[in-house]
């Protein structure tokens, strides 16, 4: 595997590339980490990307503007530019554009959902982990966002969502439930896994991504990843 980074046109934004040479074009996932627009959560980034590459995916991580440069619209632009770059370089990156999707965690889930609902989206599938859906925590994050559930249409790509019912940062009723209701109303295929308990910001929920914060290791919630792979094989491949 070769790891590289390219700068995007959006200032303070770049794309980490985890490319595995392949004789055939592979599925690919664009990872949009969380971090409340204050940081790029490393727990959601390289270790998630490397895990995807071990399952025959090409993987990418979008680094969008954060801290004093944080801006919701700029972050959305960075995600769109990342997809444009990958599709434009699909041959050399061994990517199958028909199996290219986005996965977002927390605030990154908000960005992933927003991008997937653009009319020009290049995402063929979406995965959202404990996503921010409504602008209920804008003050905490220091940005002005939007209610991405209102962006859903019948053209929204098939979506996989997971989180925990007792998530105190993105409460189920305000966020995941609001989004899945709109998916159902528009006839968008989706699969939802809301675990009974579990922390926010849990990434893969295993010891690999929870190496620093052991409270982010949860054997039960870690089931989301094999469930996603099963869903992908049935719905997308």
Model segments located where?
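Short amphipathic alpha-helix adjacent to the substrate-entry channel of hydrolases
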Residues: 42-60
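Short beta-strand element of the alpha/beta-hydrolase
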Residues: 25-34
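The feature captures the conserved acid-bearing segment of alpha/beta-hydrolase catalytic domains
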Residues: 125, 131-186, 191
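C-terminal catalytic histidine-bearing segment of alpha/beta-hydrolase fold enzymes
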Residues: 186-237
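The serine-hydrolase catalytic nucleophile loop
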Residues: 39-47, 172-175
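Primarily recognizes the serine-hydrolase "nucleophile elbow" in alpha/beta-hydrolase
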Residues: 81-148, 154
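Catalytic nucleophile-loop/oxyanion-hole region of alpha/beta-hydrolase
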Residues: 41, 63-97
